[in-house]
Amino acid sequence: RDFDSLKQDLATKFQVKKDQVYLFHSGRTAISLALLSQVPRNQKDQPAVAITALTCYAVVQAVKTAGYQPIFLDIDPKTLHFDGKNLEKALKKHPNIKAVIIQNNLGISCDIKNIETIARAHKLFLTEDLAHSLNITYPDGRLSGSLGDAVILSFGKGKSLNTSSGGALIMRKNSKNQLLADPKIASTRPKISDSLRDRFYPFFALHARAFS
């Protein structure tokens, strides 16, 4: 019941249909499956994805798990994220870039207008990773999560929406290989052992702080 209720709430927030929302045990899994859904069945060359050089290992791991080559883009010190110019340079150097992930590190808006314009011009799969930037407003007035072909949420510890663990994928772009149509993949519930660990995490954390 809670599972379906959360999917409906997210569908309402991001203005999509309920069947466009997928829930997983981690945001990392959501990133991998979003990227995998865009690889045609007859794909031969390894695709690449542009990501900010200031990122966590989970994003890199998710990209590699999906079979993509991560292309790290230098950041602007003011935004802690790459800008449109660096994305344009990367596309000239790496024509196999098929996707781009934006993160808005620490809740600071990136150069979204230029990045989106370039992504659309090159038909890149644009993913908004909102692990640290849920509900921020971009300079042009749009809310984070309102423009990506895919939107990623992480419910892990230290994220914008913290439930100890979990992740969500909101898909606005159709899959190229029907991957997400597989009921064994779409919205998988965590193992009982993982659920118990997550429920007791606050107790263990409190115990560790008290006796450290």
Per-range role (PLM):
Residues 4-48, 57, 62-64, 72-74:
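Phosphate-binding glycine-rich loop
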Residues 23, 51, 102:
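A short beta-strand submotif of the Rossmann-like class I SAM-dependent methyltransferase core
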Residues 53-55:
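Conserved AMP-binding
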Residues 67:
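Structured binding elements
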Residues 79-186, 190, 196:
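Active-site phosphate-binding strand-loop segment of PLP-dependent enzymes
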Residues 187-212:
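Alpha-helical membrane-targeting segments
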